[in-house]
Design a protein with these regions (language model features):
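Class I Rossmann-like S-adenosyl-L-methionine
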Residues: 1-225
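Conserved SAM-binding loop and adjacent beta-strand
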Residues: 227-240
Length: 240
């Protein structure tokens, strides 16, 4: 098994647990990252990004796949639709990953999961997506805003279309993690130096002095300040 195939298979298993079995994404992803913490940072980052991205963009990904497949996503075998979703995400949103590599690894995954007969189908759909991705457009609100239609309809009835769309758009904004400094264990300076040394992005220009906003970390338990109890996860609103 190649290194790339390995990490993609990990993503496949995570997504099957979440999308097909209904398990909580943050728990399954966290368990996987802990299990495979021996992998290099960039591999764990890949696992995290493809998992979270596929889940976040599922509505749009399904719409794209349906455009290029005679078999609708809902009628596909769970393994096949999951391989297509995670691969379509890479093709559409990860420019540094060659489309040819995505297609080849998807075919390998299909064959490894004993779907040799559908490997050609997987390859065909993905190569069509790759070829036509520059001309794709999304006009349906649920595809554009990545929100189920019934939720948008409910918000529109309550607040009007413009406000409903603004609410949906707010969910597309990447949110850093808010943490509270345990001042009895470490000073603000110590925490900032520790986070900076590990390459995390830190925002400290808002909120109480003991609350920070962090991002660009791979695995929270490997953040020194967190593992030592210097910081704990806390919503900004609860610290006011």
């Amino acid at each position: 098994m190649t290194k790339e195939t390995n990490i993609r298979e990990i993503v496949l298993d995570i997504l099957l647990e979440v999308m097909e079995k209904g398990n909580y994404s943050h728990l399954i992803l966290s368990q996987a990252l802990e299990k495979y913490q021996y992998l290099e940072k960039q591999d764990r980052a890949f696992i995290t990004r493809v998992t979270e991205g596929t889940l976040e963009y599922q509505l749009r990904l399904d719409a794209v796949i349906d455009r290029f497949s005679k078999v609708k996503v809902k009628k596909m075998k769970p393994v096949i639709r999951t391989i297509l979703r995670m691969s379509a995400y890479q093709i559409l949103f990860m420019e540094r990953v060659p489309d040819s590599a995505v297609c080849n690894e998807a075919v390998k995954l299909a064959k490894k999961r004993r779907f040799d007969g559908l490997s050609g189908f997987v390859n065909g759909v993905l190569r069509n997506i790759s070829r036509e991705k520059g001309s794709l457009s999304f006009t349906a609100p649920e595809e554009r805003l990545l929100m189920p239609g019934w939720i948008l309809s409910m918000w529109e009835k309550e607040y009007g279309r413009e406000t409903a769309e603004k609410i949906a758009e707010s969910f597309l904004t990447e949110r850093p993690l808010s943490v509270r400094i345990n001042q009895s264990l470490a000073s603000r300076k110590t925490v900032l130096e520790s986070l900076g040394a590990q390459g995390l992005s830190v925002s400290e220009d808002w909120g109480p002095g003991f609350v920070l906003s962090i991002k660009d970390y791979d695995y929270l338990d490997q953040v020194e300040a967190f593992s030592k109890g210097w910081i704990t996860v806390q919503d900004f609103s609860s610290s006011l």
